[in-house]
């Protein structure tokens, strides 16, 4: 994977309109994940099962993520993050949706007042064929928050190798349960519409309502 400041967010046509109307992306929680092994915490992190249950509950209620694709190498060739057929099928509803290309640095700068108040990371997912790939830590932690800060990479940044073609780059945020959205105002570089996109009239109407241009428009809708 190539981290060159481009973040690719695949979405449905309906969500594209909502995103443009609000100029924001909704954060996801850990209640619904496509990899069943994600955020599974081995029992040896804890002295007793009660602490394990507390930490799992803490993750569900206090942790948020935003997931993106990125550019990647294939046979020594650099391919654009738009070139992800799996993402178009799975997240853009069989190419009826769109892909929003965002500048990572501008995105982080736009939301720095929120992010600087909490613990966050934006890193690439590591793909593995192992169920758990965690070195046994010291099981004594004063709180779930302390544990997650120490081992966020092992818990939140590993997925099964079957998902490798997503080339995921993930923003993980700890302990901001009241925050539901992050702004992408002035962060959008382009919007790539799927080959089966058919909401042109609604998209045109939405764009014309925007008070400022927040992305580059290469064609006339």
Segments from the language model and where they lie:
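Partner-binding and oligomerization surfaces adjacent to conserved cores of proteins
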Residues: 1-221
């Amino acid at each position: 994977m190539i981290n060159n400041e481009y973040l690719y967010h695949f979405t449905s046509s309906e969500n594209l309109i909502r995103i443009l109307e609000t100029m924001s992306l909704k954060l996801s929680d850990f209640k619904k994940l496509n990899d069943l092994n994600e955020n599974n915490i081995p029992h040896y992190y804890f002295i007793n099962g009660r602490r394990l249950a507390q930490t799992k509950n803490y993750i569900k209620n206090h942790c948020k993520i935003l997931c993106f694709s990125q550019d990647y190498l294939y046979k020594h060739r650099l391919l654009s993050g738009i070139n992800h057929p799996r993402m178009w099928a799975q997240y853009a509803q069989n190419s009826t949706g769109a892909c929003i290309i965002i500048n990572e640095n501008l995105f982080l700068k736009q939301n720095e007042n929120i992010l600087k108040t909490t613990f966050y990371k934006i890193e690439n997912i590591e793909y593995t064929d192992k169920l758990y790939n965690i070195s046994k830590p010291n099981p004594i932690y004063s709180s779930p928050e302390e544990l997650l800060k120490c081992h966020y990479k092992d818990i939140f940044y590993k997925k099964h190798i079957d998902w490798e073609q997503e080339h995921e780059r993930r923003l993980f945020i700890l302990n901001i349960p009241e925050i539901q959205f992050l702004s992408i105002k002035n962060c959008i570089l382009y919007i790539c519409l799927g080959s089966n996109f058919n909401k042109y009239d609604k998209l045109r109407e939405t764009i014309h309502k925007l008070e400022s241009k927040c992305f580059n428009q290469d064609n006339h809708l």
